[in-house]
Design a protein with these regions (language model features):
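N-terminal, post-signal peptide beta-strand-biased segments of exported outer-membrane/organellar beta-barrel
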Residues: 22-98
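Repeated loop/turn-to-beta-strand initiation elements of outer-membrane beta-barrel proteins
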Residues: 58-59, 80-85, 140-146, 182-189, ...
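Transmembrane beta-barrel strands of outer-membrane/channel proteins
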Residues: 61-65, 85-89, 146-150, 176, ...
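Outer-membrane beta-barrel architecture
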Residues: 71-75, 131-135, 173-179, 217-223, ...
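Flexible, solvent-exposed loop segments that connect beta-strands
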Residues: 93-124, 154-167, 197-211, 244-259, ...
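Detector for outer-membrane/organellar transmembrane beta-barrel domains
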Residues: 215-338
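Outer-membrane beta-barrel "beta-signal"
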Residues: 358-369, 373, 388-401
Length: 401
């Protein structure tokens, strides 16, 4: 049973790092493209902040399925420097902010505005205090950008006498990126650091529980011109995570530790045609993770690995008319997973995963509206035609000025 649950956990981690599947809480255009990494979008600026210059002087509102799900982005500046103010976007406080768009695979990680680091669930869920972006041009063919996000949430009690007690979680997101914008080669690089810290003194300072979860990600994307209207896109990412929980009881500390490493690489063509943009790429992925529930004891650790070989992603955006765009995307991945523990037990699983998304966009001069539709809308129709779901999973509206 333990091996089965560990194997399931390894699969979830792998899916977060490598599947790149879109969900109902992802922003609408990218969600309709099933989270394509090679068809460029304004959401690129969240993990590659230097690209903010490309989308300057824009306001975007993202609307989820309820009034408390959504986010906002305001970008303003000149052709030399741009600034961004972000409201209620959850990848600022997500442990997957260090991975290339992997927050798209976290339910609620985008438009719910807050998500706990997995190791720190017991400390509550932090909410964003500040989330800022900045980008500046370096010469004619380069740009540099930064992102800073801080989040916190908690409760505390301070009696007239005695020690204060409470529980809290704090997260810090620091991102930096560099792009080369030449005609022969376009290159986007980013380095992201996400730090989560939690503490719980509700049982007294002598019985404090504390934890940390640190994520580091290095991501790259390259576009090489092949021929007229065709580029070769190359993507890659390395993501490292480590942390643990320490529980104190009467001065005795018990500490646990977790470690995970993920690597992904892929390549494929991008077609920029007169009335369509098409991107397809194959990718390979590898991840490994280990857990030690008590670092002072032997023979209680476990580990797992997962290999994605191969994976393929396809997406398209078609201008049906001057004002109506259809979008669709899909992804298939075949994975080899294994899990073992120090007692000599092991388990393996080979499986495939598939998913698709669709939606549309409306363009009226400087105003755009994007909709990611429920999958069943395409096959069973809307409610008034006998279908079983609503219309849009998410919607976005933007105005350029």
């Amino acid at each position: 049973m333990r091996i089965t649950s560990r194997l399931l956990s390894a699969g979830i981690v792998t899916a977060m790092l490598f599947a790149f599947t879109a969900n109902a809480n992802a922003q609408s255009r990218r969600s309709s493209l099933h989270g394509s990494l090679v068809l460029e979008d304004v959401t690129d600026a969240y993990f590659m902040p230097q690209l903010l210059l490309k989308y300057r002087n824009l306001m975007q509102i993202d609307m989820g399925t309820s009034a408390d799900q959504g986010s906002g982005l305001l970008i303003f500046g000149t052709d030399q420097m741009a600034f961004g103010i972000v409201a209620h976007r959850g990848d600022n406080v997500s442990p997957s902010g260090a991975a290339m768009l992997s927050a798209e695979g976290l339910p609620g990680a985008i438009l719910n505005g807050a998500v706990s680091f997995p190791l720190l669930n017991q400390f509550g869920t932090p909410s964003t205090i500040v989330d800022l972006l900045m980008s500046m041009k370096l010469g004619d063919e380069a740009a540099l950008g930064f992102r800073l996000g801080i989040a916190n949430a908690g409760t505390s009690t301070s009696p007239d006498s005695g020690d204060s007690t409470g529980v809290s979680q704090t997260s810090l997101n620091i991102g930096a990126g560099y792009s080369m914008l030449g005609e022969a080669l376009r290159m986007d690089l980013s380095l992201n650091l996400n730090i989560g810290l939690g503490s719980d003194t509700t049982n007294g300072v002598d019985n404090e529980t504390s934890g940390n979860d640190i994520r580091i990600g290095l991501n790259g994307r390259f576009y090489l011109p092949m021929e007229d209207q065709v580029e070769l896109a190359i993507i890659g990412g390395i993501n490292l995570g480590f942390g643990g929980i320490t529980q104190s009881a009467g001065g005795n500390d018990v500490s646990s530790s977790n470690f995970d490493l993920g690597i992904i690489a892929g390549a494929g063509p991008v077609y920029k045609l007169g009335k369509a943009r098409i991107g397809a790429y194959g990718f390979l992925g590898f991840s490994t993770s280990s857990q030690d529930p008590n670092t002072d004891q032997d023979n209680d650790d476990s580990s797992g690995t997962s290999i994605t070989i191969p994976g393929v992603h396809m997406a398209m955006e078609v201008d049906v008319t001057d004002w109506f765009k259809f979008r669709g995307g899909l992804e298939y991945a075949w994975m080899i997973q294994s899990q073992s523990d120090s007692a000599g037990n092991s388990q393996g699983q080979n499986s495939g995963s598939f998913g698709w998304s669709g939606g549309f966009g409306l363009v009226f001069d400087k105003f755009t509206a994007d909709f990611a539709l429920h999958n069943s809308f395409f096959t069973t129709g809307p409610n008034f035609l006998g279908g079983g779901t609503g219309f849009a999973a998410s919607a976005s509206a933007a105005y350029s000025f």
